[in-house]
């Protein structure tokens, strides 16, 4: 991306004129050589001004957000001690386990088609990543019985969740789970939960450690996508744990806040996963900008604008502008527009790290042509000038 220096041309020009001509006004006739030399100097300086104006400089890339500490499942850079790259082909293994007090009678092939949405799950990650990530899911069909009733297991604590996976792995002695990127276990009663820990808390397996795995009870490709994204480092965007302030402030605009309504991941998450190319995003920290912003699913154009709230070189919080993705179901009508939200890397999963700033309410959050956005929390103001035929929007952003 290219940027240009902004120079106060008029002020600089007037200073040059004043320094050249006013001192000469009384002695112009008898000091013509000196006058001539100053005139030439002035013209040279003016030309340098215009050369400087047109000289492009490399625009600043979006820096990693500063978490200001050790934050669990942050919107900042992924913890490399837990999470692997989110680029390339990923091998997944899907298992099926039940309990004596929760016996599963549905055929596991039918269950697989339901939870994967007949391929919708894999398609979602392929399309959202612009083809940069593919998921191959291998199945071990047939329900295998755990040794105790479901009531004796839990995924509510790290310890109980780890013990559950240790026993599940013991049910499959011939499988090398270290050969897989993501382990997915279908089971009733235990809920939908992702495990992700550093080695000291990870799942012990054959003298090594497995850092990520998930269990799923729901039959939904979007719920599975939500839990899989946890294995990739994303936090929950819905609120829990006694957090003060708004509940679920990200609304239905990302799978991590609403697997029931969202159709994909916010632009920030595509950026975090390194799916969104550098020329598709813009980082601005000052000035007035008139920009055309394209949908995230477009093949070109700037689709995400990021503005720092604090230190522009090492921010901990930013605001993001993008075009919203259409919601699923009955709420899809008029759900596409300019979406504004903040991302705070200091806040852990479930503690509102992403907040959408809606035009009306969270279901009607996007802004449309003629709308203005200003908020006391935001470092910028936005005018939505028009919507183009190609679904892009022309906006004006003024960064304070």
Regions found by a protein language model. Name each.
Residues 1-34:
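N-terminal secretory signal peptides that target proteins for export/translocation
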Residues 40-52:
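Bacterial N-terminal signal peptides
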Residues 54-59:
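Boundary at the C-terminal end of the N-terminal hydrophobic targeting segment
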Residues 61-77, 105-106, 197-218, 288-400:
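Non-catalytic C-terminal accessory/binding modules of secreted extracellular proteins
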Residues 61-219, 223-225, 310, 383:
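Zn2+-dependent metallopeptidase catalytic core
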Residues 87-92, 130, 138-141, 180, ...:
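Sequence-level motif detector for i,i+2 pairs with an aromatic at +2
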Residues 98, 259-260, 344:
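Residues at the C-termini of beta-strands that transition into short coil/loop
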Residues 177, 182-331:
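Extracellular hydrolytic enzyme modules, especially secreted metalloproteases
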């Amino acid at each position: 991306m290219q940027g240009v220096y902004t120079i106060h041309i008029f002020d600089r020009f007037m200073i040059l004129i004043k320094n050249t001509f006013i001192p000469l006004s009384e002695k112009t006739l008898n000091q013509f050589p000196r006058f001539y030399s100053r005139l030439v100097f002035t013209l040279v300086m003016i030309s340098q001004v215009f050369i400087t104006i047109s000289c492009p400089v490399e625009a600043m890339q979006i820096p990693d957000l500063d978490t200001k500490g050790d934050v669990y499942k942050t919107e900042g850079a992924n913890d490399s001690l837990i999470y692997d790259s989110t680029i390339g082909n990923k091998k997944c293994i899907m298992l099926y386990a039940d309990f004596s007090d929760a016996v599963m009678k549905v055929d596991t092939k039918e269950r697989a088609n339901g939870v994967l949405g007949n391929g919708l799950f894999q398609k979602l990650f392929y399309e959202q990543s612009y083809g940069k990530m593919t998921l191959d899911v291998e199945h071990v069909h047939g329900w295998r019985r755990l040794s105790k009733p479901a009531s004796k297991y839990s995924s509510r604590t790290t310890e109980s969740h780890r013990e559950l996976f240790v026993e599940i792995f013991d049910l499959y002695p011939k499988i090398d789970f270290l050969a897989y990127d993501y382990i997915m276990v279908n089971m009733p009663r235990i809920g939908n939960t992702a495990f992700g820990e550093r080695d000291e808390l990870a799942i012990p397996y054959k003298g090594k450690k497995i850092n990520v795995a998930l269990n799923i009870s729901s039959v939904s490709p979007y719920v599975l996508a939500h839990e899989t994204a946890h294995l990739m480092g994303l936090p929950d965007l819905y609120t829990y744990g006694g957090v003060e302030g708004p509940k679920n402030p990200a609304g239905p605009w990302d799978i991590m806040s609403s697997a029931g309504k969202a159709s994909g991941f916010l632009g920030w998450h595509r950026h975090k996963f390194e799916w969104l190319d550098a020329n598709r995003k813009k980082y601005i920290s000052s000035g007035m900008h008139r920009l055309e912003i394209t949908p995230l699913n477009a093949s070109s154009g700037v689709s995400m604008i990021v503005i720092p709230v604090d230190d522009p070189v090492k921010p901990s919080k930013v605001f993001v502008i993008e075009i919203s993705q259409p919601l699923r179901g009955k709420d899809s009508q008029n759900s596409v527009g300019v979406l504004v939200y903040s991302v705070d890397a200091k806040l852990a999963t479930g503690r509102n790290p992403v907040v959408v700033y809606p035009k009306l309410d969270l279901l009607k959050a996007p802004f449309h042509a003629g709308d203005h956005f200003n908020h006391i929390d935001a470092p910028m103001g936005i005018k939505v000038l028009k919507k183009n035929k190609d679904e892009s929007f022309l906006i004006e952003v003024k960064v304070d």
